[in-house]
């Protein structure tokens, strides 16, 4: 379980601590940092994975260089330049000491804390700007010295998996079959309407038992009987429909509630044992709708 997230110099946040618990709902005005908090969790996980891939099984060396991360690899945080990750786009501090200009890097610090197996753990990462296309990631420094000791990466943190699901717009009428990597890229770019049939197809093909649970849930909630997704080789597309009141309909004919619920269920089953981050910017309008 995650308990707290500390964010420094990331996008709209200069320095903030976010208390986390078993289930958390972020509520606030537009552009107040709700999505940014989720993206900070995603960036922390991306950095940790890249670090562990390169330095797995090794002790953290004091002078070890950071792992390079390309901004295009952070598909859930799409920006035209890596500089947009930094608070107010500031990647360097410029000052003057005894008439001499002094510069220093502005680092993004992300510290995640949690509890696992009745033990508390704390894992901090720092990110240094390299250029518009990439940045460096390394374990968080423990002091501000020239060659600082660095925070150890706890074993409990290595197993954390985070899946970020942006809001869904209107469902596309056709959908080309995609590999898993392409699905993740489109989800990260917010193009969830282009992958719903692909997610259904993956679950139906690889996890038929879970697909039955999904279809049963949709039928009980919406009275719609989902058909199995079918790959149409001639067009390279995935076709899928449902039946309601004895009428066969294409999935694009379903209501937004049905489509969004199906997206959430398939995404959860496609990312088992993961912390699911759901971004729904229109959720605050539900109170207004109920008043009408």
Annotate each PLM feature.
Residues 1-57, 228-292:
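Switch/communication elements of ASCE P-loop NTPase nucleotide-binding domains
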Residues 1, 14, 102-108, 119-121, ...:
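Residues at beta-strand starts and edge strands
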Residues 40-120:
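Conserved P-loop NTP-binding catalytic core
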Residues 153-157:
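Short, conserved catalytic or adaptor-binding loops enriched in Gly and charged residues
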Residues 24, 112-116, 129:
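Beta-strand elements of well-folded, non-transmembrane domains
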Residues 97-104, 129-131, 231-235:
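Short, ordered beta-strand-loop transition motifs
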Residues 117-142, 261:
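A short, surface-exposed beta-strand/turn
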Residues 111-115, 140-142, 146, 159-275, ...:
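Extended helical coiled-coil dimerization/tether regions that scaffold
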